[in-house]
Amino acid sequence: MTSASACPCPICNNTVGNLLLDERPKVPSLQNVALLTQAEALAFPQGTITMVRCANCSFVWNASFDPAKISYDETYNNDVTSSAYYLAHLDAMADRVIASVPEDTDIHYVEIGCGEGDFLSLVHQRAAGRMKSATGFDPSFTGEDKLPEGAKVYRNFFSPDNTDQIPAEANVVCSRHTIEHVADVQNFATALAAAMAPGRTMFIETPDANWILEHTAFQDFFYEHCSIYTPDSIRVLLAQQGLECDVESVYDGQYMWIVARLPEAPGHANPVASSEKLGLHYLENKRQMMAEWTTYFEDRRAIAPVALWGGASKGVTFSLLFNSAEDTPIDCVIDLNAAKQGCFMPVSGTMIVSPETAKSRGVGTVIIMNPNYEDEIRQNIREMGWGAEIRVLNG
């Protein structure tokens, strides 16, 4: 087992009192991949997670992370736009970005880690003609044919060396669900700061480690997310780069929405020593919850097969914690993303199916992976006339 004291915090360099939250070998190096055969899934590349929480600034990171194990290709699929709840969240965040620019001012938008440009395009759509330029950065981008007029995406990581690719008139910088994938937090924060200028506002969205610990959401620790922030730790990191920020909880507490800017006067954020109670709460509750779920699976599968609903990151981790080559209490995983159906989850090899297929397999228990989607999933099950028992993880 790794000693947490041997792991200096990447943000504040603290080594005193750091807490080892979770250590798991043989986890998939990528979550959001759907493999065509079970053999491919079982042989998928693996890594180790060693999740450590800083006792000083509360940052959580994977001390065993190796970026060489991460390689995004055409099998990567993190599309969750089949959820009305998530689409409403995207709309709300896009509207916040638009509202940050006065109504009589054109929007010149920049996005760092823009993926296929989906959020960029959404902001353009909802800005109703106000967006006059859009600049994105993402090395995996392939969607030129889907970009709105006036948009350009550079297929490279953004760094202080290519600030000249940002138009001088840019007034909004956005980076959603990128920072948690970056192990070199100091260099990435330097790049974010380099993108700033007087009159620009930066928006960052990323998971909140406090929510994970408070809800004992052990399924939210996985290899891709090597850097998980709290309100305190993101303030400290950005302050080190001369930025001040406000942090708000969004997505029913699972994410943070960070609004950063250049301060009018120099300032700094001192880490507030974080109580270890939250981490200890997580450790104790995790042991109890794992035991309870093991018993629950034994009881329910004696009646009928059990399925998870949610074939994204949470479902991949949860299935891996309970399914093995020797025992598979989880029969299958349901996902509305048609591109995943008929495929298999990395490492666990659990099959991904449509709701209709799960029903036809005789599934009698459905466990919802994300409580945010409970209402729409329950409605879907009712409309199918399916009498499955429903349980909600972290609900």
Please name every model-derived segment.
Residues 95-216, 228-243, 260-262, 316-317, ...:
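Conserved SAM-binding loop
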Residues 38-43, 218-232:
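Acceptor-substrate binding/catalytic loop of class I
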Residues 23-31, 220, 248-266:
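Conserved catalytic loop of SAM-dependent methyltransferase domains
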Residues 77-88, 280-287:
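Class I SAM-dependent methyltransferase Rossmann-like catalytic core
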Residues 2-85, 249:
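N-terminal juxtadomain amphipathic helix
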Residues 96-97, 122, 257-395:
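Hydrophobic, well-ordered beta-alpha structural blocks that scaffold small-molecule cofactor pockets
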Residues 135, 154, 246, 353, ...:
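General small-molecule cofactor/ligand-binding pocket signal
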